[in-house]
Curated annotation (Swiss-Prot):
Organism: Homo sapiens (Human)
Lineage of origin: Eukaryota, Metazoa, Chordata, Craniata, Vertebrata
Listed InterPro entries: SNURF
Assigned GO CC terms: nuclear speck; nucleus
Membrane-traversing stretches: none
Tissue specificity comment: Expressed in heart, skeletal muscle and lymphoblasts (at protein level). Expressed in brain, pancreas, heart, liver, lung, kidney and skeletal muscle.
Alphabetically ordered keywords of this record: Nucleus
Note: Encoded on a bicistronic transcript that code for two proteins, SNRPN and SNURF. In addition to the primary 1.6-kb bicistronic SNURF-SNRPN transcript, SNURF-only transcript is also detected.
Protein family: Belongs to the SNURF family.
MF terms in GO: ATPase binding
A Pfam family hit: SNURF
Descriptive protein name: SNRPN upstream reading frame protein
Subcellular location per the Swiss-Prot or TrEMBL entry: Nucleus
Keyword Nucleus listed: yes
Amino acid sequence: MERARDRLHLRRTTEQHVPEVEVQVKRRRTASLSNQECQLYPRRSQQQQVPVVDFQAELRQAFLAETPRGG
């Protein structure tokens, strides 16, 4: 019984400590990635590219809504 308790205790302590380290690593990675992306691609190009896709989708929906079905 004592061994089982020790295993459970070890499991709980490791589960508590490991995610904190993972979160810190993920934050560092995302921060470094965002910095690299800002340097590689200027924000103007990103802002211009994204609305075009939405605009095309809106046009397609409006066109499908206006065209009579079956005809």
